[in-house]
Regions:
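Hydrophobic beta-strand-centered segment that forms part of the acyl-chain substrate-binding groove
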Residues: 55-92, 101-103
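Residue-level signal for inorganic ion chemistry
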Residues: 47, 93
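Catalytic strand-loop segment that frames the active site of acyl-thioester-processing enzymes
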Residues: 3-45
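HotDog/MaoC-like acyl-thioester-processing domains
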Residues: 9-11, 17-21, 85, 94-139
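Short amphipathic alpha-helical face segments that pack within enzyme cores
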Residues: 48-56
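A generic structural signal for short beta-strands and their flanking turns/coil linkers
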Residues: 20-24, 35, 70-75, 87-89, ...
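Hydrophobic residues in beta-strands and at strand termini
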Residues: 26-28, 79, 122
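Short, solvent-exposed secondary-structure boundary motifs
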Residues: 1-7, 82-87
Length: 139
């Protein structure tokens, strides 16, 4: 059974680059929930949405590798460019190394221009069951 599409975090094209980075793409259309109230006269993607997209890229790539990853914080985040409805974003995150905790750099770009960048703290939930496409194995 396919995983239903997430209307808040509609990531697509998840991949691992030849350099080992985790990437995904997203295009938030004008009807996206993220634009509700932000701002009616000139819709903009909120910064928190960009952080949520980086977080979700880590979580989904972790699941692909059978790891349950969470993001517990951000540091050094800089927002460099406004993002408008319909623009495609590329989210790129340093891959999670072996171990239970790491700081990973992330970049969000649009048309090759930096939108946001910084560092996120990722942790692996230890003692969890391996993850499959239908949930946790053994449950």
């Amino acid at each position: 059974m396919p995983i239903p599409r997430d209307r808040w975090l509609p990531l697509k094209d998840l991949r691992i680059t030849p350099e080992g980075r985790w990437e995904s793409r997203v295009r938030l259309g004008p009807s996206s929930e993220w634009f509700s109230g932000h701002f009616d006269e000139c819709a903009l993607v909120p910064g928190v949405a960009l952080l949520a997209l980086a977080t979700e890229t880590v979580k989904r790539q972790g699941r692909e590798q059978g790891r349950l990853l969470e993001v517990s914080g951000f540091s050094g985040v800089r927002f460099r460019r406004l993002v408008f409805p319909g623009e495609e974003l590329l989210i790129s995150v340093g891959a999670m190394p072996p171990g239970s905790e790491a700081k990973l750099d992330f970049h969000v770009t649009c048309h090759g221009n930096t939108v946001a960048h910084g560092e996120l703290k990722a942790t692996q939930e230890l003692g969890s069951f391996p993850v499959t496409d239908r949930g946790f194995a053994g449950t």
